[in-house]
């Protein structure tokens, strides 16, 4: 909401030099930093029901950071609002830099406890994604991997958009 307000000379006259939060779109990242005089912006990504989260603690611009969990981006057709499968009906992993649907691998360490409605819980779990019998939490978000220079050989991700019929800020 701040970036949509009319500019005023006092905006940079604040004591903030760093902020921590989530939801800052990449297309307004640079403008936000410059306009409000913010040197360090740390982002995080996650959901209360999800089994996967990200943290940008290294101050890499326009990124939600790294994931300690089992993240997978699969090809997604935005126009038709559906996952893209290969000719054998298998999921296709998104290429580097290509937006893909974020899935979080469900296992003993990264569990999905579900909702109070079992049918709703079942709809969020995709099965046999990489191998027979596996389970993946469908976040409903499109992300892409980006190059941030050094990253300890751990991929960095950028938020792209929510899929489906969702409220937009």
Model region roles, listed by residue range:
Residues 7-10, 79-87, 128-131, 147-152:
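Alpha-helix termini
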Residues 1-77, 91, 111, 115, ...:
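Gly/Ser/Thr-rich phosphate-binding loop
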Residues 92-169:
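Conserved ATP-binding/catalytic segment of the ANL
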Residues 69, 73-106:
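Glycine-rich phosphate/pyrophosphate-binding loop
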Residues 37, 43, 80, 135, ...:
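Generic secretory/membrane-interface signal
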Residues 26, 56-57, 86, 125-129:
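Short secondary-structure boundary micro-motifs
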């Amino acid at each position: 909401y701040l970036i949509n307000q009319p500019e005023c000379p006092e905006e940079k006259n604040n004591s903030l030099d760093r902020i921590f939060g989530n939801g800052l779109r990449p297309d307004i990242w640079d403008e936000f930093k410059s306009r409000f005089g913010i040197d360090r912006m740390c982002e995080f990504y996650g959901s209360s029901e999800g089994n996967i989260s990200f943290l940008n603690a290294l101050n890499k611009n326009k990124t939600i950071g790294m994931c300690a969990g089992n993240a997978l981006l699969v090809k997604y057709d935005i126009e038709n609002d559906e996952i893209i499968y290969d000719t054998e009906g298998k999921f296709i992993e998104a290429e580097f830099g290509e937006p893909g649907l974020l899935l979080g691998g469900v296992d003993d360490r990264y569990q999905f406890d579900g909702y109070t409605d079992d049918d709703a819980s079942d709809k969020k779990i995709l099965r046999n994604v990489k191998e027979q019998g596996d389970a993946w939490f469908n976040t409903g978000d499109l992300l892409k991997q980006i190059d941030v220079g050094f990253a300890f050989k751990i991929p960095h991700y950028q938020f792209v958009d929510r899929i489906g019929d969702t409220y937009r800020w």
